[in-house]
Amino acid sequence: MPSSVTRRTAFGVFGIAGISLLSACSARSSYKGKINFNSYKGITAALYKPGTEQDPPANIPEPVYYAGLNERTAEGLYKFIGFEVAYYNYLLFRGFTSPWIERGFTDSSSCPCYTTYRDISDRWLISDTYAPLTVSIMDDMPFEGPKDNTYVWTMKFEADSAARLYDKTSRRSVNLNSLNGTDTEDKGYFEYANGKWKLLSSSSLPSSWSPGKTASF
């Protein structure tokens, strides 16, 4: 686990799970704009209770991975990105370590990937929304990547200015949007393999690569 959140780690954490896409009709001609994800388990999204300096948040909704995310289309990739952003938010609430390490709340040497950063009674994320981190698509459509079955889409990673990391013991608070990589654009590098999308490390994208042919659908 890196000790700080950079543009690469912010986008790279989403990866949990052809020269062109297979022939299919795209659902729309442009995907520019903020992604809104609305597939959560049960009714927890409606019951979400924001945290305060006295109490941690409650009823944090867990995003649901559904079949449409595996479609080899621009729509499928768009939905996949939406799920990964939603899951990143979920990890922040449930205990993803990087932001807490960066701000000095947690010792990086004792935090293997995806372990919890704290006991729920000590530290938590205070946010009016259960999705304080958002991603906007900056291009109408994805571009063909440098290798077969790879695609590139420019995205902007942003954080709600009111959301903050809070330590009850020290009464210390740090705005989420102060993390490295927020309010920045980066190229999301994706591959379609074995019937699923996955996010590749942007560091593996050739430095000489530049957008060329729009992916066909």
Regions found by a protein language model. Give the residues of each.
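C-terminal motif of bacterial Sec signal peptides marking the signal peptidase cleavage site
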Residues: 23-24
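Acidic, low-complexity proline/glycine-rich segments
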Residues: 37-60
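Bacterial N-terminal signal peptides
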Residues: 15-20
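Exposed beta-sheet edge and beta->alpha loop/turn motif
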Residues: 29-41, 144-217
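Long amphipathic alpha-helical coiled-coil segments
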Residues: 131-138, 167-172
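Actinobacteria-biased recognition of intrinsically disordered, low-complexity terminal regions
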Residues: 1-2
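Core segments of small alpha/beta cavity-forming domains
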Residues: 52-131
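N-terminal export leaders
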Residues: 6-11
